[in-house]
Amino acid sequence: MARLPLPNRDDPTLDAVEAAVENNQRSDVRTYMGWSGLGHPCERSVQYDFLMALRKTFKTSTLFKFEDGHGTEERVNKRFASLESLDFKPTGPDGHQWGVSSLGGHLRGHLDGVIKGLLQAPKTWHVYEVKCVADAKFRKLKRLVEEHGKDALEHWDEQYFIQAQGYMGAAEPQLKRHYLVCVTPGGREMTSVRTDFQPKAYKWAVEKAERLITQQELSPRISEDPEHFVCKHFCSFKDVCHSPQVSARVSCRSCAHSTPIIDDAAGAPGNVKRGAKWKCEHHDKLLSNSDQKRASPQHLYRPDMLGWAHPHQFNKLDNEITYRTDDGKEFTNCETADWKNKRFTSKDLQHLNAETMESDASYLDALSRFCPSAEIESRKKKVKPDELNDDLPSWM
């Protein structure tokens, strides 16, 4: 449901503008694991992002921060470009952002630029990054630079530190220095920190990413308490992780049949835009990004992506998984829906939970909020869903 403007101030027009900004935000999923997020304190959150568990949306206040950050970055870039002694390249030869890629393209990132000619190290190329932060965090970095020098970034923000190591290590050719320009909103104050490349830290980060990409189960939560500080304030996947009412979105990434393939050729520097490889074991096909986002009618949830039930039995021949809820009720995730007998497609289960699937009325009510009326009628008549699906992946 779209956000409606609520009267929280004396100007309903401003309320309506904020609601429009929030409702119109782009909420596409990212198709790779980003270096910028790899250092998140909760590994499961990193996996949810990689597995396209939800389309992330943000509150208006956060969207305004993003706008401020992008605008400030442009201002800072213009300032650096005005110093003729600097060899400053905010984009690559093709006019696009510099991109880095590792693990067959599954682990990627985009640099704000590269720079050479810094007065404190004029002959050395640096990864160039701009971070716009609140005043308190800005002051903290200034203090840490005085205390720790080139080690300040690691003490200031571990997530930024891992991002910096990744950008240096994955660059072609590999870079040995990172230059972060930290600014307050609007760019009124600037400070900086230079960071050396640490091969051991880079190796550790790549190994962590490979483990999160290839392991067949989700990592433990950072906390079992959904009100934990990180869960509450710094995770977009709190609902799908902690709530028994929410399932991951249907895509090939959430399917038990899909497998990421780490092919170094696919992730070579010249192939950053080609995308990493995923394979559907059920259809024995490689999956394009568009295929992955849509999924096929044969989709079965990875058991750990259906958080409100536990797998009981897998029938490979019929392509179905039987689950049990905490109170012992059974249902089946399968290709063809028969909701009266508790047999559900993944698209059905995406909008259901242990409570709503217990009665016909509540099931239809839940389904009607998300599915076209023709698809609801097909459930009543037991028509195969794929007979109605005219938007199948290209490989079907």
Spans of model-derived segments:
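Residues immediately flanking
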Residues: V130-C132, F237
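A short beta-strand motif that forms part of the nucleic acid-binding face
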Residues: C132-A134, T184-P185, D284
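Short beta-strand element of the conserved SAM-dependent methyltransferase core
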Residues: G113-I115, W278-C280, H299
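Conserved active-site beta-strand-loop modules that form the wall/rim of enzyme catalytic pockets
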Residues: T124-V130, L175-L180
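Metal-dependent nuclease catalytic cores that hydrolyze phosphodiester bonds in DNA/RNA
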Residues: M1-V127, A134-V145, D151, L349, ...
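Secondary-structure transition/turn motif
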Residues: L111, D196-F197, K279-L287
